[in-house]
Amino acid sequence: MNLGKLNKTVILIDTDYLNQKIKENIEFYRDLYPDKELNTLNLYQLIYNFIVNARVESDERNIDVLFAYRLSDSLLYSTNPGNVWNFANAENLNIKEFNVTIRSFFADEDESCSKHFTIMFKMLHRSNSVDRVIMVADSKDLNNAFQFSPELLEKNLFLFRDDHDTNIDFPINFVNIAYMIAQSLGLDRGEW
């Protein structure tokens, strides 16, 4: 697997984890607000929310978004666009003031999505061009990687995960992923 030429800031997404969180939160907010139409999450708005809430510097306009996924499970729950397989050949877009390149990389048949994510994260760590990694993930595989390779914590890291229910035992700045999903569904701050 070759991740190609990368920008200074990379968002790395564990697709299985993101999918689980999208499903949980959409169902939660549908129950909480039955009168609201909460049918589809805009993926590009979610990516923008990740960028802004991870406090990407204003001079960093070029950002890579990499999806780690399994071939058998490339669909995102109730999301548009909803198939990360479509990003296999890279999609370049402008999301508000940012130039974003979205790509996806599938795992080997015998590899879990979280394991594949961890392998990709280690590759990003070795890349001299990458200064900051924004992760959408939470797994024992990732925690074990930090435990057995503490040098992985040397890059500027940021994490989107749950507030309390986490597998990560290391001090990494994070924002609750539920807030990003709620924002992307169009809910006001007082509603989440």
What spans do the regions from the language model cover?
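Domain-level signal for Mg2+-assisted phosphodiester chemistry and nucleotide/NA-binding surfaces
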Residues: M1-F105
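Nuclease catalytic cores that cleave nucleic-acid phosphodiester bonds
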Residues: I95-W192
